[in-house]
Amino acid sequence: MIDCHIRLQQGQFSLDQHFQSDHTVIGLFGASGSGKTTILHSIAGIITPQSGWIKVQNQTWFDHCQKINLSTQQRRVGLVFQDAQLFPHKNVMQNLLFGFKHIQPQQRQFEVDYIVELLKLGHLIDRMPIKLSGGEKQRVALGRALLYSPQLLLLDEPLSALDAAHKAEIIPFFQKVIQDIKIPMLYVSHDKAEIEQLTDVMWYL
């Protein structure tokens, strides 16, 4: 369950949004500049709202009145951005293991081999990011986020940088992850059809 009320002011930009849902995969839809990424950054702990609260799975991550503000590390969210943001000097396997190595063994929900097979990355594990297509990079970024065993997966326009062919290639992998892995997800996009295809419910900004 996600329950958040985020209020903040950044220069001329003002945000005051309240969302609550028990659905597993939530879509956040709105035009560019409507505050979608700001909401994700607030939930992740990258930005601190001026007031409000953020509760995920009955745990309070932020509450202005109660003076609660967990760090990004304490929240343990998985982030996937539109440009993948892989480490260019690390191969695919090293990228996949980055978050995995930074959590305790008892916190790990998935084996590396399971995620590699789920996302069909076996033939790519020794490649450097520069040798990957856009769709392959996003699969690696998704795998890296999942291996961090997040309490919440935040996907910020993960397909917007891909052409139609690469979108068609990667959407089945997202659908497979949604079907097989029951991690709450917040999926941001300005593409309404994409959100309708991949999420359980849509929030409008």
What are these regions (language model features)?
Residues 61-78, 102:
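ABC ATPase NBD coupling module
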Residues 64, 107-124, 175-176:
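Conserved ABC ATPase "signature" region
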Residues 128-132, 136:
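Conserved ABC ATPase signature
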Residues 142:
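Hydrophobic anchor residue at the start of the ABC signature
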Residues 147-151:
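A short, proline-enriched helix->beta-strand linker immediately N-terminal to the Walker B motif
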Residues 153-157:
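Catalytic Walker B motif of ABC-type/P-loop ATPase nucleotide-binding domains
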Residues 182-188:
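Conserved H-loop
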